[in-house]
Amino acid sequence: MAVQKSKVTRSRRGQRRSHDALTGPTLSVDKTTGELHRRHHVSADGFYRGRQVITPKGE
């Protein structure tokens, strides 16, 4: 069993946990359609940075 050498204070425990918070996805507005999409990701209709890079499966 792992046993700590000394007690971890509330302050040190909080400092360690300070980087654990979750952040929401960063969203941008598509130039061509005006839809929201995740930054640096291809949108649902296949556009990336204003030009079509893939054709969607539905077409």
From Swiss-Prot:
One BP term from GO: translation
Region described as Disordered: 1-34
GO molecular function: structural constituent of ribosome
Gene: rpmF
Species whose genome carries this gene: Marinomonas sp. (strain MWYL1)
Similarity field: Belongs to the bacterial ribosomal protein bL32 family.
InterPro entries recorded: Ribosomal_bL32 (IPR002677), Ribosomal_bL32_bact (IPR044957), Ribosomal_zn-bd (IPR011332)
Keyword Ribonucleoprotein (UniProt): yes
Highest taxon of source: Bacteria
Protein's UniProt keywords contain Ribonucleoprotein: yes
Identification of the protein by name: Large ribosomal subunit protein bL32
GO cellular component, one term: large ribosomal subunit
Keywords of this entry: Ribonucleoprotein, Ribosomal protein
Pfam family of the protein (one): Ribosomal_L32p
Compositionally biased spans, kind Basic residues: 7-16
Cysteine disulfide partners in this protein: none
HAMAP family xref list: Ribosomal_bL32
